[in-house]
């Protein structure tokens, strides 16, 4: 999933130089570092103190503003603060998307974009969800995931006053199957959902 996302998403982000960007659910800074390298002024927000510490190490404390916060609560950010918001592989962990989209719309500047990448909800039919290994314990962790239909994203965004600019579904192709034996079992299934909303 990450390989497919990292191949497809950058082309949708455009020129970020000089933009104020919010990385929602930034985790360990996988995208935060790329956003900073692209010349953006970046704020990363995540509920996990440990992940934010890793993001700070990856990006550099002086390069980014990192905020510890639960996305289920109103964002501790000012109205109209951002030109672009990125939510990469995060929203499946949010139970109700509507309050989050209202908050994202609130912190958008006029004509700002909200870019969302997400595991396609069809993957839940295959009992596939986010999983990672905790480096401290060595245990596999499966955070709570919600199989939001595509319409949940669209309706939450429209309800928050955003418009739909882009929606695409991406399958595992032959290139990914060659690069990853695990990817082959998902051939023919939509794996990645990409959406862009406009304020």
What are these regions (language model features)?
Residues 163-199:
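Conserved Class I S-adenosyl-L-methionine
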Residues 1-19:
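Conserved alpha-helix/loop element of class I SAM-dependent methyltransferases that forms part
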Residues 145-168:
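Short alpha-helix
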Residues 75-84:
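A short acidic, Gly/Pro-enriched loop at the edge of an enzyme's catalytic core
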Residues 22-24, 28-73:
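Class I SAM-dependent methyltransferase SAM/SAH-binding core
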Residues 113-139, 144:
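Conserved class I S-adenosyl-L-methionine
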Residues 98-113:
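A short glycine-rich, Lys/Arg-flanked "PGG" loop and its adjoining helix->strand segment in the class I
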Residues 84-97:
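A short SAM/SAH-binding and catalytic strip from SAM-dependent methyltransferases
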């Amino acid at each position: 999933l990450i390989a497919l996302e990292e191949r497809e998403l950058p082309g949708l982000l455009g020129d970020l130089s000089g933009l104020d960007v919010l990385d929602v659910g930034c985790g360990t800074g996988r995208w935060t570092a790329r956003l900073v390298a692209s010349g953006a002024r970046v704020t990363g927000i995540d509920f996990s103190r440990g992940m934010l510490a890793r993001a700070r190490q990856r990006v550099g404390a002086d390069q980014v503003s990192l905020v510890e916060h639960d996305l289920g609560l109103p964002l501790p950010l000012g109205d109209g603060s951002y030109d672009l918001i990125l939510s990469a592989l995060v929203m499946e962990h949010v139970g109700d998307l509507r309050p989050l989209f209202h908050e994202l719309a609130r912190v958008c500047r006029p004509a700002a974009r909200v870019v969302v990448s997400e595991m396609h909800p069809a993957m839940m039919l295959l009992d596939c969800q986010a999983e990672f290994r905790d480096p401290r314990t060595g245990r596999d962790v499966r955070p709570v995931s919600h199989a939001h239909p595509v319409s949940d994203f669209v309706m939450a965004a429209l309800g928050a006053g955003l418009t739909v600019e882009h929606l695409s579904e991406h399958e595992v192709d032959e290139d990914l199957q060659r690069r990853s034996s695990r990817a082959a079992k998902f051939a023919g299934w939509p794996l990645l959902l990409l959406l862009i909303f406009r304020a």
